[in-house]
A protein has these predicted regions:
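N-terminal catalytic or cofactor-binding beta/alpha core of small enzyme domains
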Residues: 1-205
Length: 205
């Protein structure tokens, strides 16, 4: 599959249509799926789209070769995204074919809530031509299940509770974490920048 246009517009549309704080659409991948996913990332880093697409299809994902015609010269991106009917909301992972900053990876684990951080990550990715950008697949509170993270938060309820499995910053058995580990191992001197937001209290300056 191939697309042309503006990568920022394309990814912002994915963010806008991602599931919100309710619905329980996020399901955790199993070990076999995590291993298959790791192979997909290997193929993408090697620019082997045919093998990446074959393996991605088995997980109800697809690889879109996206040509951004708003950049001069035009830039090609590999977009690993869920198929439209896929039940697997594991996130969207975009790789630059010819990055300017080969070791820079930008991440947005809370595309819906920390407000605007998903779209800010996309903007930074496009304008730096970083190696990759990771976008979570749902609102951080989408799942009803809790992760094994030792911390607690009140972000999903009025009282403090454990983090949800749909919170990519607080769950290590995810495609988000697996992709992070892969790129950390395979890209020399890799730098990961993860965008977060914080609430402002009336007492804050």
């Amino acid at each position: 599959q191939s697309e042309t246009g503006n990568i920022e517009t394309y990814l912002n549309n994915i963010i806008d249509n991602a599931p919100g704080s309710s619905g329980n659409q996020y399901t955790a991948p199993n070990n076999s799926q995590l291993n298959d996913w790791n192979a997909i990332i290997d193929f993408l880093l090697d620019h082997n789209l045919a093998s990446a697409r074959t393996k991605a299809n088995q997980l109800n994902y697809q690889v879109t070769e996206f040509t951004d015609t708003s950049i001069s010269p035009n830039q090609i991106f590999y977009v690993l995204e869920k198929e439209s009917t896929s039940p697997n909301y594991w996130g969207t992972y975009v790789f630059s074919k010819t990055p300017v900053r080969n070791n820079l990876i930008i991440q947005a684990p809370h595309i819906k809530y920390d407000t605007n951080t998903g779209k800010q990550a996309v903007y930074c990715f496009k304008n730096t031509l970083a190696r990759a950008v990771f976008l979570s697949g749902t609102h951080r509170c989408n799942s009803t299940n809790f992760s094994s993270c030792s911390g607690t938060t009140s972000v999903c309820s009025s009282s403090s509770q454990s983090y949800k499995t749909s919170d990519m910053a607080h769950n290590v058995t995810t495609m988000f974490q697996k992709t992070t580990e892969n790129l950390f191992s395979n890209i020399s001197n890799s730098v990961f920048i993860q965008l977060h937001g914080f609430g402002k209290r009336s007492s804050d300056p």
